[in-house]
Amino acid sequence: MAVLINAKMDALLESTSRSFYPTLKYLPKKIRGQIGLLYLLARVADTIADSKEGETSELMKILTQYNEVAQGKSDLLPDFTGLAEIQDNPAEGELLLNVQDVIDSLEEYTVPDRERILECLDVIIGGQILDLERFGVAKEGGEISALNSN
């Protein structure tokens, strides 16, 4: 497939999305890169939210900080080194170590495209934060998390 975003992002996209990446060729060429970048941005958030270690409040803080940087509201990107080291999937660890490059790739697109991508990302991260609030950190061994009764 031709370059979607740029060589580095394409490699991250291919390594983190084995089943999604091949389907991009079926989308119109005009939007493949934007959809691919949104996938990477969302995958960063998903990797943070699904981390099996750390306190719920800390993961929510990291998600919020990540979103604020992606949305252009802050320049203080969290240090993802610790989270990257605990990932079972090495490609997800590599993605976390390259978050700034993923965010910087937004500049490849027009302002309206960036706005749409970031609007979608904001909704996705909002849902992930809500899941963390309701269910807490992902648990090993298929343990079920109960909802609060209120």
Positions of PLM-derived features:
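Acidic catalytic motifs of isoprenoid enzymes
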Residues: M1-N150
